């Protein structure tokens, strides 16, 4: 099995090193890393379209790109690797990607880029920042990949996208995997305004809001109770529940305009 690994924290981040070292020990597995040169957190699915991308190789063998997480996976799958991987894995991220985070996350964006190309993909994140219990998280990621492989679920003919969040706990303390839906966060914190040395106003995006929907069955609830959360994701953002209602509204606004 051939695995492509990327992330959004950069090719030198402890999370991607730990993930690579764990996955390469799986029997019959080859692992390649193509990751951003620098931290690209919150870049979502952004692609670089108006400037060239350059690929370099570090002494570790990791290849790094002056672009976004999605750039890395995109160019890897469209020519850089020279073959099609069986699995795309992103992470391990320094901090949670739960609920609304998945919209902004470069970690999820890298995995989603693989999924868009028809390759099964997983985004791995640790719940808390700081890399605490990172070896345990990498071991759990390895275990999940091994189990999916053993059950013949790593099938390029039937791609899927999974979002996995791992509490920062010893491996033996982690509770069983919980399959759950995404929760929701409150609105982000207020923008931070500072003054530059030249007297100009500088603006920093505020931190993510606390959990709003953390009810039982959500990723927030699962990880808060020591479980590893797994949420299947999809690309279709259509609100199917309200589609019929909006169709009726559109007919009233512009009769005959709906197809």
From Swiss-Prot:
Instruction: State its location(s).
Output: Cytoplasm
Q: Matching SUPFAM superfamilies, A to Z?
A: SurE-like
Q: What class of enzyme is it?
A: hydrolase
Gene Ontology molecular function, alphabetical: 3'-nucleotidase activity; 5'-nucleotidase activity; exopolyphosphatase activity; metal ion binding; nucleotide binding
Under catalytic activity, the entry for this protein gives: a ribonucleoside 5'-phosphate + H2O = a ribonucleoside + phosphate
Q: Keywords for this entry? A: Cytoplasm, Hydrolase, Metal-binding, Nucleotide-binding
Cofactor names: a divalent metal cation
Q: Does the keyword Chloroplast apply?
A: no
Q: Which domain of life is it from?
A: Bacteria
Alphabetized Pfam families for the sequence: SurE
Spans traversing the lipid bilayer: none
UniProt keyword Transcription present: no
Give me the comment on cofactor binding: Binds 1 divalent metal cation per subunit.
In this chain, a divalent metal cation is annotated as bound at 8-9, 41, 93
- Output the Gene Ontology cellular-component terms: cytoplasm
Tell me which EC number(s) this protein carries.
Answer: 3.1.3.5
Its biological function? Nucleotidase that shows phosphatase activity on nucleoside 5'-monophosphates.
The entry's family comment says: Belongs to the SurE nucleotidase family.
Name of the featured protein: 5'-nucleotidase SurE
Q: What is the lineage of its organism?
A: Bacteria, Pseudomonadati, Pseudomonadota, Betaproteobacteria, Burkholderiales
């Amino acid at each position: 099995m051939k695995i492509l690994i990327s992330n959004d924290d950069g090719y030198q981040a402890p999370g991607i090193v730990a993930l690579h070292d764990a996955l390469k020990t799986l029997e019959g597995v080859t692992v390649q890393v193509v990751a951003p040169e620098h931290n690209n957190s919150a870049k979502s699915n952004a692609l670089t379209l108006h400037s060239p991308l350059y690929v370099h190789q570090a002494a570790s063998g990791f290849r790094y790109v002056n672009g976004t997480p999605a750039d890395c996976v995109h160019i890897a799958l469209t020519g850089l690797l020279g073959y099609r991987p069986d699995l795309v894995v992103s992470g391990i991220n320094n901090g949670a990607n739960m609920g609304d985070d998945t919209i902004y996350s470069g970690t999820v964006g890298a995995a989603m880029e693989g999924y868009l190309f028809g390759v099964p993909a997983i985004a791995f994140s640790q719940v808390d920042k700081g890399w605490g219990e990172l070896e345990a998280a990498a071991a759990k990621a390895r275990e999940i990949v091994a189990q999916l492989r053993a059950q013949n679920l790593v099938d390029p003919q039937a791609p899927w996208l999974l979002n996995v969040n791992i509490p920062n706990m010893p491996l033996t303390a982690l509770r069983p995997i919980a399959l759950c839906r995404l929760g929701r966060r409150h609105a982000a914190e207020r923008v931070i305004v500072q003054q530059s040395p030249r007297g100009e106003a500088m603006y920093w995006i505020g931190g993510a809001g606390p959990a709003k929907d953390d009810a039982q069955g959500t990723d927030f609830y699962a990880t808060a109770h020591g479980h590893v959360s797994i949420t299947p994701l999809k690309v279709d953002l259509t609100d199917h529940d309200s589609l019929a209602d909006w169709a009726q509204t559109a007919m009233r606004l512009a009769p005959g305009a709906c197809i």
